[in-house]
Amino acid sequence: MLFFTQCFGAVLDLIHLRFQHYKAKRVFSAAGQLVCVVNPTHNLKYVSSRRAVTQSAPEQGSFHPHHLSHHHCHHRHHHHLRHHAHPHHLHHQEAGLHANPVTPCLCMCPLFSCQWEGRLEVVVPHLRQIHRVDILQGAEIVFLATDMHLPAPADWIIMHSCLGHHFLLVLRKQERHEGHPQFFATMMLIGTPTQADCFTYRLELNRNHRRLKWEATPRSVLECVDSVITDGDCLVLNTSLAQLFSDNGSLAIGIAITATEVLPSEAEM
């Protein structure tokens, strides 16, 4: 009986996933935009740290992470993994932030406590191969986050490749105050802070004749996703506002990235 119940639940999940795919294609196919359906993953790093803090508080229940992340993109070119980053683009240029230009950076994947260290040139392959983070390509894409109703903490992440660089999009559901979850969305450049200053990203929510835009300069992944969210330098939505723009538990975020100035290495070319 238990086996039958598990199989039936798996079938329902597949039906739900197919419905999400159909809905994404139906809504955005007319605009010709690349759409990626992203399921949430519980933030194991945040959960682990919270467990360590709450071990001395037995009245708080333990949290069991579940719901693996899956990315489903709709575009004929989305399977191609292209590495546009050039080695001479990726040196650490901020002496105050990095005294040693060859200091390796830590893994910035917000989902896991990963002990990996490496140079910026190999961050993208690491996220792609070890953490299974998919890559979308194109100047304008649509990020469709599903199951927004799941309890915090949860993350939806994807990499975005355009203008010869890779960006990391993170949507996080987190409780800053107990019982009051919020959604935080930010775009970070997989590069140095100097390179990040050369770009502008825009996040747009659009539903039922309502539109909400957030436009900012991306932060570098060297500055850590957690610090960006703590500083509030990102799009912040409370639960009621997120529900206003969501459709059947899914939130569609339009993403656009533009170059605000020509990088020195590109000007030489």
From Swiss-Prot:
GO BP annotations listed: negative regulation of protein targeting to mitochondrion; proteasome-mediated ubiquitin-dependent protein catabolic process; regulation of protein stability
Key word Zinc present: yes
Primary localization class, coarse: mitochondrion
GO molecular function, one term: ubiquitin conjugating enzyme binding
Protein residues bound to Zn(2+): C107, C114, H126, H131
One GO CC annotation: mitochondrion
InterPro entries: 7-in-absentia-prot_TRAF-dom, SINA-like_animal, TRAF-like
Transmembrane segments: none
Compartments it resides in: Mitochondrion
Matches recorded under SUPFAM superfamilies: TRAF domain-like
Keywords, sorted A to Z: Metal-binding, Mitochondrion, Zinc, Zinc-finger
Zinc finger (SIAH-type): 61-132
Domain of life: Eukaryota
Known role: Negative regulator of PRKN translocation to damaged mitochondria. Acts probably by destabilizing PINK1 protein, hence inhibiting PRKN targeting to dysfunctional depolarized mitochondria.
Protein family according to the UniProt entry: Belongs to the SINA (Seven in absentia) family.
Descriptive protein name: Seven in absentia homolog 3
Gene name tied to this protein: SIAH3
